[in-house]
UniProtKB/Swiss-Prot annotation:
UniProt cross-references to InterPro entries, sorted A to Z: aa-tRNA-synth_I_CS, aa-tRNA-synth_Ic, Rossmann-like_a/b/a_fold, S4_RNA-bd, S4_RNA-bd_sf, SYY-like_C, Tyr-tRNA-ligase, Tyr-tRNA-ligase_bac-type
Residues spanned by motif 'KMSKS' region: 236-240
Name listed for the protein in its UniProt record: Tyrosine--tRNA ligase
Family, per entry: Belongs to the class-I aminoacyl-tRNA synthetase family. TyrS type 1 subfamily.
Gene: tyrS
Compartment(s) of residence: Cytoplasm
Pfam families linked to this entry: SYY_C-terminal, tRNA-synt_1b
Secretion signal, residue range per the UniProt entry: none
GO BP of this protein: tyrosyl-tRNA aminoacylation
Gene Ontology cellular-component annotations: cytosol
SMART domains, per database record: S4
GO molecular function: ATP binding; RNA binding; tyrosine-tRNA ligase activity
Lineage of producing organism: Bacteria, Bacillati, Bacillota, Bacilli, Bacillales
EC class name: ligase
Amino acid sequence: MDILQDLESRGLIHQTTDRERLEKHLQNNQVTLYCGFDPTADSLHIGHLVPLTMLKRFQQAGHKPIALVGGGTGMIGDPSGRSSERSLNAPEVVHGFTSKLQQQIAKLVDMESNASENTVVARNNHDWLGNMTIIDFLRDAGKHFGINYMLAKESVSARIEQGITFTEFSYMILQSLDYLKLYEEENCTLQIGGSDQWGNITAGMELIRRSRENLDENIEVFGLTVPLITKADGTKFGKTAGNAIWLDASKTSPYEFYQFWFNTDDRDVIRFIRYFTFLSVEEITELEKEVETQPEKRVAQKRLAEEMTKTVHDEAALEQAKRITNALFSGDIKQLNVEEVEQAFKDVPNHIITREPVGLIDLLVDAKISSSKRQAREDVKNGAIYINGERVQDMNYHVEEKDHLGNKFTVVRRGKKKYFLIQVESIS
């Protein structure tokens, strides 16, 4: 199975330019391709994983991928898929974001793993866009773009009524210059991107043809886009409780990351396995059978969560995420270390206490776990209160040093799922 057939079988092709010629081009050549990532934050998020894994799929098929970080275009902001203009970040902020994204991408696509001839190459478009004068921009690029041609592109036409600035209007030309630069310097003949990038990609192809039409060369350049990732329930992919799922462990912990994938809907899980993992067709078919016959076991979700956590983080982070998951399922909170407790209960209500012993009834009221002392006594009496996973029904119980996990936390649970994190005041 060639690379395009594999991508098609996984549902990863939204559009291509001249599919037949592209197929022959890939079969007959070691093709250099690129995908761009603008530094709009200090981390990539899971929406970037499809294009990142696409680079890796092409690499495994013997081609030469380039990961282009938009240190230059990130100063401007892509209007594609947006209803309003982005706020411009300060140059030093964009430079900082660029550096962090380069580090993340290097880790995710194993840039430093070997020195083979198709190792993923990293580039930063600030290297050429940052030094371009306005005269060069208008003479060398602007003259090849008709206004009507640009207005017809969806990224622009969708914004005409709301209004679009010249800054964002020009973004298409800047991205086109990237393709031209990589074509000239790296013999790059394929650009890939999200479905919202189609207009920018085809504009880049047009710039290459027009700027080099007087040269005696056979110009073959192509574009390929991946589909917008959707969810069966209609909610936005890549967010949970309104928060983005980041690839940086300090922004989204490996446990949260694991749980995001583990909670995938049965209707989505096989599609996501095809999109995001490198599992074989045979393995995916077996997992599909599991979803159909034993959905309650969540075998496919577990495999998806394991593959993604291992890929984005590492084996140790995966084991940690699984340990937290098992501890919460079994109620054995005491097996977790301090870091794991912080990961597991990062978003639950918290309360700070001193190191002095505190009566359980008072603690339940002070931490707003129970609404009143009367309610607190009822909760304890009815067996609804757990300290570090163990039920406590003693009205006179005091939370003290032995209950402080790692000398730092006590986890209180009310009922089946309502957790509270009690933080012990640090010794000054």
